[in-house]
Amino acid sequence: MKVEHRIGVQAPASVVWDIVYDLDRWPEWNPLYTRVAGAIRYGGTIKLQLALPGQAERELVATVIDWSPNEAVHWKTSLLAGLVRTIRYLEIEAMGETGCIFSNGEIFRGLLGPRIARQLRSSLRAGFEALGEAVRDRAEAHWRAQGGGATLDAR
C-alpha cells in the first residue's frame, strides 16, 4: 500500500534538492521531521523524529537505500521485527528549467504493513501534504531571493 503527496514547485529541481539534501536545516522548516541526524549516502543511517498530525512523536531509524542528486532520496525502515517494512521517498521531477514536481510518500510492506498504512492514512496524508507545502514555500522563497522568476500564486 502506498500513501503519497505531490505538489508543483515554481523553482528549479536543483533548488528543491538543496533544501532536501541539507538535513541539518530540516528542523527549521520541516513540520513532519522535527529532528534529524545523519547524512544522505548509500547505506547511511538517518535518525528522524516523526511528527504526524494527531499522533505522538516518535523516533525512526532509517537506512538510505538510494539517492540521486536533484532527483530523489529513498530510505527504508523496519518495525515490529520486520512485520512492517516501509520505503519512504522524496522525489523531484524537473518540469523545465524553473519548475518541478515534488513527491513524498511511503510504501508499506510486510505482514502488517497494509494494516498500519490504513490506520495511519489520514495522518500520513496530512503530514506529507504539510511537508510538500513547506518544501514548495521554502524553495520558491529561495529561488526568488536568488533573483529567479516571480511565482504565480495559483493556490
Residue ranges and their predicted role:
Residues 1, 77, 116-120:
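Residue-level detector of alpha-helix boundaries and kinks
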Residues 7, 55, 126:
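A short glycine-/small-residue-rich loop at the edge of a beta-strand within enzyme catalytic domains
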Residues 1-41, 155:
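Hydrophobic ligand-binding cavity/cleft-lining segments
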Residues 27-28, 37, 53-101, 107-112, ...:
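Hydrophobic-ligand binding "helix-grip"
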Residues 42-47:
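Short coil-to-beta transition motif at edge beta-strands of beta-rich domains
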Residues 107-155:
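A conserved amphipathic terminal alpha-helix motif
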